């Protein structure tokens, strides 16, 4: 697999709608950086959050996810409680080409503050807003800034298109919009 350059990412985003909205140059003016980088794209977090809480003594079960496990917030600054977790989504909508696998890494700005961003790979043929998982590993409240950089996506091109894409098998998260909870 080959990691794809800024030139390729720009072309796919502008001609094929791979990333919408697309920010062509990295923005760093007084914010956590986002936009096109040399070999990746730094995506922004939207102002839509689901913050985990234990007010109702719920148990987190991926097979039977209880909606009372979290509170919804629309805000420019999300505060994640100590040793807690929040879900969010990217501002950008992604359309992954059939011969590409996308992996995501957290931003060092957040990592150096004990905030871990996790995203599973974006499979060939998948499209949607990416649900972001933020873990606050510290004993202190932690801030996440909406409309600023959250993570970096790296685009890996395979040696040929896959036989069966995520779209072909009608994957359960295909076309997701907004923060998407676990599905079976």
From Swiss-Prot:
Pathway: Pyrimidine metabolism; dUMP biosynthesis; dUMP from dCTP (dUTP route): step 1/2. Keywords: Hydrolase, Nucleotide metabolism, Nucleotide-binding. Its EC number is 3.5.4.13. It is an enzyme of class 3 (hydrolase). The keyword Nucleotide-binding applies. It catalyses: dCTP + H2O + H(+) = dUTP + NH4(+). SUPFAM superfamilies: dUTPase-like (SSF51283). It holds the Pfam family DCD. GO terms for molecular function: dCTP deaminase activity; nucleotide binding. One of its GO terms (biological process) is dUMP biosynthetic process. The active site is at residue 133. DCTP binds at residues 107-112, 131-133, 152, 166, 176. Coiled coil: none annotated. Belongs to the dCTP deaminase family. Homotrimer. Catalyzes the deamination of dCTP to dUTP. This is dCTP deaminase. The lineage of its organism: Bacteria, Pseudomonadati, Pseudomonadota, Alphaproteobacteria, Sphingomonadales. The gene is dcd.
